[in-house]
Amino acid sequence: MGDEAAIHIMGAGLSGLAAATLLARAGKEVHVHDVRADSGARFDGDFQALENWSMDEDFFEQLKEWGFDASEFKATEFDVVDLIHPDDKITQATTSKVAYRIVERGTSEHTIDQGFKRQALAAGAKIHYKSRVKEEDCTIIACGPKGTSAVAYGEIFHTDHPNHIGFQLNDHLAPGSYSYLIIIDGVGLICTCLWRKQKKSERFLNETIAWYEAHYPNLNRTPIKRVGGKGDFTINRNYKQDGRYYVGESGGLQDFMWGFGMRMAVWSGVLAANDILGKGDYEADVRKHLMPYVRTSVANRWLMNRVGDRTFKRMCTAWMKDQKKSGDGLIWIGNLFRPKWYKSILYRLVSPFMLQSDPKAMGRGVRRMPFRKALKRDVWEQSEAANAVGAQWDAARRKGGKTSFADDAETSKDEQSEHAISS
């Protein structure tokens, strides 16, 4: 890139901007490059969750310690979450702490993407949008998904329903995964995640919306747009190679089980910046602080791939039973996410069979979780209620409603969406 003193970062997402902010504050010349027109441009106003149960320390306290201002973006806190069982029973997980923070992704001023962008610019970093650079010319690689391991489809809508979160485990509506309802200040999102590739995938979203409308009759939903997302889940042999730091999704630093990734994205950007500033060893710090959680999530995903609604029901029942005993709805789910010795053993046993080598990884030894095939139980026709939801969306689309995914294409195709799933 000409000037060896300058630090060039590929990707103006959360991990790249986090690193850029700390480096620029330390007096480094920092250039961030992104092929898109703005930070958050690959999202479309999607709501995403910052979970707060996998670690003892609150994520916003971590942000403060690292020097980031969380007031730069809108985050809505929840201490109650509807837990929806596969048999349609609705219970509530409650805590005296913060269970979730919901943030919006995209280019609006209040999004987390723009909040981190403003902090990077204020620190003195220069951001170059619509700028293509080569990986070998950059110090930090902070790109989004390249392959596809899972997808998510959602509908954003207007509603007069109060702020609310619902989290549903249902293998019929969300194969191998979950669906959710998020309502923030008059705008709602119903989303289903698919960890098995499907044909005519829009039926899963239609059926999921129909389910929520039947069980939350006061939604008063007016569709705005439909959005899609994909997740790319990888394990890297090296996180620093040939002088380059691979952060966030480029480093495979996210949750394989349910797709949470924003916390590790920011954290990995911080660790990369610290290494460059002589305050740490990125490879060692990633393996110490982040990889135990990633390996645990791989073991969890392997288990999730082998169960269905019967086990999902047991999980929901155990969660509520533990909450009744402990008085805190975060303890059970926190234990599921936190590293355990037996999950470390399970990871070593199953990862060779669960992950496939990526021949285009520039010698980094990247192994990717493939998008699993559909099962026989995934083949079904929409209900009348789902057909009505689809017809409602068709009417909204004719009036200008936009959609960011193809209706009938098989969901394994990368071109179906450029958004990211829960990260």
Locate each region found by the language model:
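C-terminal auxiliary extensions adjacent to catalytic cores
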Residues: 311-410, 414-423
